Amino acid sequence: MISLLLISFFTFVELNCENLFDTRHDSLKHDEEFLPTSALRWTPYRYWRKIDRISKDILSCGELDSATVVPDMVVLTEVENDSVMHDLTRRSLLRGAGYDYVMTSSPDLRGIDVALMFSPYAFRLIHSHAIRVTPPAGFRPTRDILYASGEVISGDTLHVFA
């Protein structure tokens, strides 16, 4: 009976991280707004506090009765780079969840990307790629759409566009 319940239960979460940038300058992007010397004073303390809050938000989505079960899959929008995703999955409260992730490398001038974080126990990634969004003439480039497909624990294939 328990195994049937586990097979039919899959938690999917989407979270806008609202500019999750690290504190290091990327010379290929316009990320100057999120540096310790900027008007925002984006310090390591503020960065790690944001990582902590996001990880708590994700964990709260998996709470079931008095137990905490991490969501099986989380789409994260407005993340800067692989370094930020590494910190979130390996150096935050989520480190014990064992999440894997894939992400885009979009042409957005500030470096804003989309990531898909997933539990390898609930989702086996088969394929992922970015779908480029061509902006209308006169508009600046935007983030790509992330497409991922994989097999869920029931054996079905799940297609995700984020």
PLM region spans:
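N-terminal, active-site-proximal structural segment of metallo-dependent hydrolase catalytic domains
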Residues: 8-112
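Sec-dependent N-terminal signal peptides
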Residues: 1-9
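Structured beta-strand-rich core segments of catalytic domains in phosphoester-bond hydrolases
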Residues: 79-161
